[in-house]
Amino acid sequence: MKYKTIVGLEIHVELSTETKAFCSCKNSFGDEPNTNVCPVCLALPGGMPVLNRNVVNYTVMAGTAFNCKINNKSKFDRKNYFYPDLTKGFQITQNDNAICTDGYLEIEGDEGNKKIGLFQIQMEEDTAKSLHTEENETLMDYNRCGVPLIEIVTKPDISSGKEARVFLEKLKSTLRFLDISDCKMEEGSLRCDVNVNIKDMETGEKTAITEVKNLNSFRGVEKAIDFEVERHIKLLENHEEEIRTTRRWDDAKNETILMRVKYTASDYRFAPEGDLPIVHITDEEIKEIVDKMPELPDQMIERFVKDYGITREDAGVLASSRELAKFFEDLAKNFKDYTLLSNWIQTEILRRVEISDEEEFKLPFENKEFIELLNSIKSEKISNNAGKKVLRQMFETGEGAKEIIDKLGLVQMTDTFAIEKIVDEVLDENEQSIIDFKEGKDRALGFLVGQVMKKSRGKANPKIANEMLVKKLKER
């Protein structure tokens, strides 16, 4: 490998608290602009911040889930910069003494399992939302100003765009399981900035770090990193130098575009936040928070493999969403062939419906009807293909499985005497296929099974038909 890709991520996650981080204003997306505001989040004279305790609790949960050290003491800082989205002229954040430090998240990397290190998870406040009009005006909605955020800062351990996407998918799934954020990128409750550069492994030369913003999807993150890697390789190969810059991702053009020279920490003139006290949290308080945490995806995967005997890959799919996992376990209480259940959920249910953690997942028919269908397949009352036909009609009409099976006449023929009669007829009518089979042409058997199914109008049990054909072909 001539070039090594070096990627770090900065992920901002809005927390789903009822009120903002430092005032009692409602934390609610989509409300009428500038209705959830007060002297504190508008920085009017006399407005003083008071920390929302749930912000601390939620951050401790995230830190625990991502294997961080939870610090008993942490402090807030002021990040100074002038922009209309911050009326104070500074953002309340945590710079050098965050509540959660030194964590990691393990993912399936490009070369196997890999731990992506985390520098820290810090508490901070969000900024107002800028709205640009066709008249070239910029309007500000301060409803978002002061909404609680956690910023998750990774170490530069990510080696490709794909690894970054996998990391973000797992991080989002974990946060959703914790129920501390809805992680909707389209609403801005999960945002990601990328820092990327490359190193020539032969000379040790590195390119300057580029920060990429305006990434509104995980696929966009992956593509932006891949684009920047190629751009940085060209910089090295052409012996061009570039200072640290901030660029934005243009999804339509599939390229990054220069925004500005990148700020450094000194540009923000970080200073301690004097209006907020040191955050103290005891080991007992941390334990109380951790004890109330729900089962996390990795824990659920281990349990699914152990309790249900399904593959780790299948368990990973089923544990990718709280609602999907709940759906599987509800069905597993009454249907014990867990592999068949898992396969049908993944191949037939998930391609028809999108399961979201925002609302309880329900089929357009009762769960017991789906179990009735699976029992019919398992007992070989109907074939697998017939089962797919039945499920399709169940989704279209909401009718029960048995009702559709009976109405369409899909019950398999299992009478061996009846199937034997059809097999004999097929063999008598296809002498050439018998010759082909004896000459070792495997396709001949498939053709003969197809003829049996055709004569039986799809009702013959294909397993019985196949076994009977092989037996009779050997006898001829």
Regions found by a protein language model. Name each.
Residues 334-335, 341, 349-364, 372-377, ...:
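M16/insulysin-pitrilysin zinc metalloprotease superfamily fold
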Residues 1, 309, 332-341, 379-382, ...:
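Structural motif
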Residues 1-295, 306, 312, 333-337, ...:
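Basic, nucleic-acid-interacting segments
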Residues 16, 195, 199, 230, ...:
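Amphipathic alpha-helical core segments of compact helical bundles
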Residues 142-147, 185-192, 202, 411-476:
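C-terminal non-catalytic interaction appendages of large macromolecular assemblies
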Residues 285-292, 329-334, 370-382:
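Extended, non-catalytic structural segments that build the interaction scaffolds
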Residues 361-375, 381-454:
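Strongly charged, low-complexity linkers/loops
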Residues 188-200, 268, 306-329, 338-356, ...:
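Core structural elements
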